């Protein structure tokens, strides 16, 4: 089994947005993690992030977004990490130091806590977090 990963919501959203560039790579990446049983360690906020983004892309089709969240929640090798006080404090420091959005900093904090690579399509995460956590795209 390979090393666990933290997968940003951008990967899931891209995978389920077939008209977006790289969607096929994101889809294959998620499927390979599932197939190979590689632990996926993500903040629990990944679910509302995905639902919000997909529902918006689907002309406010919230039913599709909710079904998708259920499918993701049922990935057997997925661990949803709640935001506790320590993780929040670490995310505060990361957000302030690296000028990141709060959710991006939370993914970084989860990645640091569990010693995972952070896999993302988010340009700010890719550009700013390499000094504190391994950051990569699904095709690397």
Which residues make up each language-model segment?
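Acidic catalytic patch
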Residues: 18, 44-46, 70-96
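Short beta-strand scaffold positions
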Residues: 7, 41-42, 82, 102, ...
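Acidic, PIN/NYN-like endoribonuclease modules and their adjacent C-terminal/linker elements
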Residues: 1-4, 77-81, 108-140
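Short, well-structured N-terminal submotif of metal-dependent ribonuclease cores
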Residues: 1-42, 58-67
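Short, conserved active-site loops that position catalytic residues or coordinate cofactors/metal ions
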Residues: 9, 44-52
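Alpha-helix capping/helix-boundary segments
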Residues: 11, 46, 87, 106-107, ...
């Amino acid at each position: 089994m390979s090393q666990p990963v933290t997968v940003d919501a951008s990967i899931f959203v891209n995978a389920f947005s077939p008209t977006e560039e790289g969607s096929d790579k994101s889809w294959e990446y998620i499927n390979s993690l599932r197939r190979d049983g590689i632990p996926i360690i993500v903040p629990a906020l990944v679910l509302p992030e995905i639902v919000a983004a997909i529902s918006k892309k689907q002309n406010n089709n919230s039913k599709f977004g909710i079904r998708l969240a259920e499918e993701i929640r049922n990935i057997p090798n997925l661990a949803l990490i709640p935001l506790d006080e320590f993780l929040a404090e670490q995310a505060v420091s990361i957000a302030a130091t690296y000028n990141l959005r709060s959710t991006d900093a939370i993914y970084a904090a989860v990645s640091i806590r569990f010693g995972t690579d952070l896999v993302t399509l988010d340009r700010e995460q890719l550009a700013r977090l390499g000094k504190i956590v391994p950051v990569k795209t699904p095709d690397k």
